[in-house]
From Swiss-Prot:
Residues 24-60 form a propeptide. This is Thermonuclease. It comes from Staphylococcus aureus (strain COL). It is found in: Secreted. Residues 58-70 have a biased composition (Polar residues). It is an enzyme of class 3 (hydrolase). Binds 1 Ca(2+) ion per subunit. Residues 58-83 are annotated as: Disordered. The gene is nuc. Its cofactor is Ca(2+). GO terms for molecular function: endonuclease activity, active with either ribo- or deoxyribonucleic acids and producing 3'-phosphomonoesters; metal ion binding; nucleic acid binding. It catalyses: Endonucleolytic cleavage to nucleoside 3'-phosphates and 3'-phosphooligonucleotide end-products. The active site is at 114, 122, 166.
Amino acid sequence: MTEYLLSAGICMAIVSILLIGMAISNVSKGQYAKRFFYFATSCLVLTLVVVSSLSSSANASQTDNGVNRSGSEDPTVYSATSTKKLHKEPATLIKAIDGDTVKLMYKGQPMTFRLLLVDTPETKHPKKGVEKYGPEASAFTKKMVENAKKIEVEFDKGQRTDKYGRGLAYIYADGKMVNEALVRQGLAKVAYVYKPNNTHEQLLRKSEAQAKKEKLNIWSEDNADSGQ
């Protein structure tokens, strides 16, 4: 619709210019010719104002919701709203399995969840056995989720389950992200980062850098060189 109005405005401008030309050629013929000249000039000015307004409106509509009508995304708008696309969903705790795994009741069904973007030392691995700081990580997660009045899960933009059928999500205990809390305490590393399931990657890396700086738990001097 805007395109048609713009075309009509351009036609009006052309007609106004022609009218001004006619008025100029007849301006010496009397008072009526002068009035005609002023009228034509006013029409041209008004037309130009309308065309300018319509042009601005058309440009604004091209980037509605961060997506151009041509199909390409506006990166500025997209980056500002990308995290808002994630949303938290309610769940209830069944049990904490280990540092990075919990079992929840989700949408009326029991489901095991693997915390996204983090890896804690093992406690129940068939080959690795119990690793250093594994029990501490398990106890930390257990305390967070068992003491919470509200548990929520937040899926990212990619796949929601792994090959074992476990849900891949960020887990929140009373609004605090368990994934990030583990990393901040030096009880988990940032790991298994696969786009687009990495919305909170930078948050976790910032917490990991701080835990390293403070040499917390797996980043302590005794374990820093061992890859723990």
